[in-house]
Design a protein with these regions (language model features):
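N-terminal loops that bind phosphate or other acidic moieties
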Residues: 1-111
Length: 111
């Protein structure tokens, strides 16, 4: 089964998308969140290490689909792919779909 990673600049946004997706599919696939940065004064942003760890947490040879909200989230996801073991990275796809709609469509298709 393909699993998903939601990458967002906002932890609250990503958690909300993940919660909605999991409610719609009742846990049909695993979904991880990589969102926000560890800065209490400026929590908005993305972190390539968080993205890499999220991918590793739901990895399956069947694949991992990564959905992102804004431009620099794509850069973080691309960096995360470079940090992954190449054997693992070949099973990871980055998806340019709108974050909410794309995540919902992907979890329904994967479930």
């Amino acid at each position: 089964m393909v699993n998903l990673v939601v990458v967002s600049h906002s932890a609250l946004l990503a958690q909300g998308v993940a919660e909605l997706a999991q409610q719609m599919t009742q846990g049909g696939c695993q979904l991880a969140v990589a969102a926000g940065v560890d800065d209490l004064d400026h929590p908005i942003g993305t972190d390539a290490i968080k993205v890499m760890e999220a991918i590793e947490s739901v990895y399956t040879p069947s694949g991992v689909l990564v959905l992102m909200d804004l431009g620099s989230a794509l850069l973080s996801a691309e960096t995360a792919l470079e940090l992954l073991d190449p054997d693992m990275a070949q099973h990871v796809q980055l998806c340019a779909a709108p974050l909410v709609e794309g995540t919902l469509a992907a979890v329904v298709a994967a479930s």
